[in-house]
Amino acid sequence: VSLSLAGESEPDAAHLRRLAALAVRIRPALISEHLAWSAWNGHYFPDLLPFARTTEALHRIAANIGRAQDALGTAIAIENPSHYLRFDGHAWDEIDFLAELARRTGCTLLLDINNVHVSARNLGYSAEAWLDRFPQALVSEIHLAGHSQDPALGESLLIDSHDAPVAPEVWALYRRFIERAGARPTLIERDGNVPAFDALMHERSMAEATLREGTPTRQSRNASHPAPPPQIRTCGATAYGSCLGS
């Protein structure tokens, strides 16, 4: 939603007012934003730009999340972005940084599993190990999407392009998380090369099957707190349902 929460300046007040009015009108299930920045010195960049995860950045972003939540009248969800280059200057691990933001602000976390896979491949770490450390209780929604290879670098650089089917590796990570954490509302993103409607519904059916198959594992561990029923949405060029975020 272009809030640029990791930027050096506060979220644009006029934009927040317009977003709040839109939320009142359409009553979205969730409002989300990436852990990234996209505006500087009055200029907007149509991208999700990285930053150094320092303690100073933690204070600044927590304050910006608080401002956004106050303006919107609700907690928002913060999404893990995709990473393409190793960024110098980090003082915080990404998962610890996200968890601390949630602790300070009351926000929830939006887990984009395609971003997990893309980042792990690009930076050379284990997506499974990263996912297993993610704070399950803080996840309010999951995103699935397809990715592409960089035209010049090929498999050595994956792009979170939302223009392809969800990859087998991403489905495997999704099953891994659901088996451990239980069902979560899930959104499948598709913004380019949109296929026939039947193909989109097939992916929806795959996600629903994963949620159904994964849910009993959690229920067997904690029968007094059954998991919520599966919720699947698709969002993008063939959107239906309500979502604010990306």
Feature annotation, model-predicted:
Residues 12-109:
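Active-site acidic/histidine proton-transfer and metal-coordination neighborhood
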Residues 9-10, 48-52, 58, 119-181:
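Gly/Pro-rich active-site loop or hairpin
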Residues 1-16:
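Glycine/small-residue-rich interface belts in oligomeric ring/scaffold proteins
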Residues 231-233:
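Charged/polar low-complexity intrinsically disordered segments
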Residues 197-216:
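C-terminal helical cap(s) of enzyme catalytic domains, especially alpha/beta-barrels
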Residues 1-4, 35-36, 81-83, 114-118, ...:
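Active-site beta-loop-alpha junctions enriched in small/polar residues
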Residues 31, 112, 142, 186:
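Conserved, mostly hydrophobic/aromatic
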